[in-house]
Every structure is written in structure tokens, then in C-alpha cells.
């Protein structure tokens, strides 16, 4: 799992050198993006997607809320477009491209840099904002296919519930190489296994027999 600061609430800003940045700061769920109308004042990736027409302002979150397009445009204009001498749409596009590049670099960490060819894989776009970025990311990373699952906004929570519980333990033994006592080493492994079994039993979500 590689984590990066590029989610729907990641804040876009211009640094002291005049470069457009996205993240690592986030507006979170509250106040959230400016377009949520909950008091947010700094433009986010979600605001940029809205400005570019990738989100329907009148049907968001299954129609449970509407988005403030005017507020999103004004926030991007003030924080990004004017300082950079860009149009609002141009600044919004830059925000999205920077976010996409960060995600592509993260993909390369777990693919190319580990000896895997991205062309052999499918990109699954999930998360609240994932589907809005998946195709462009796949193009840049050289991934030939994209899958958007049903209910992508709940995929992470579902994965948490169904994934295997994994725990790691370690122990340090300091001995001379000519004084290694294998029964002592075996005893440490047994102790670690017992501790792992107890931790597994204590985990509320754990079920089944542990494997070591």
C-alpha cells in the first residue's frame, strides 16, 4: 500500500516560488471542498473536477447534495489562476494534472520499480474521486484497461472488512556466531508464534485459524 497526498480534498496552492502545488494539506470532510458549501475556502481537487465539468453540480453523492460551482470557480481564481496568470479552467486543469502525476508516480513505485510491467495489469478506479482520474492515470502509466467497480466510493471500506488480518512480530538475539544455540532460537520462534496467536484472538475482526 502506497499512500500519497492526492485525494478529493487535497488543497491546491501556489508556493513562494510561483509553482502550483496540490497537497499534502487537505480540507478533509469538514469543511471539505469549497463546492460543498460547508465553509471551505481553499480550492481542492474536487473543486477542480467540478470546474472542468467532470462532476454534475446538481447530482452529487447520489443526488443527496448539490455543489457550488460559482464558489469553486472563485476559489480557484483567487488562489491559483490569478497568481499564475492562467484562466480558471487552465488552473483547474493544472491541479488535476499535478494530482494525476502524483498518482502515476505512486503506481510506478509498486510496478516498474518492482520489476512489473504495467501493461500486464488492469487499473481499478475506486474511492470517491478515483473514477474521475482513472483513465488519464492509466494512459500515463501505460495500463491498457480500466475497471470501475459498482459503488466505488465504498470499495475501500469493503476491502477493510473482507481482507485478511496480518500481524508481524520480531525479536532480537545477540550472540556470537560460534555460540549459536539453535534450541534458543527455536524457543524465540515459539514465543513469537504464541504472541501472534494471542494477538489474532484479541483482534475483533479476526476469524479462522492463523497461519505462520
Language-model segments: residues:
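N-terminally biased helix-coil "hinge/interface" segments that flank
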Residues: 1-212
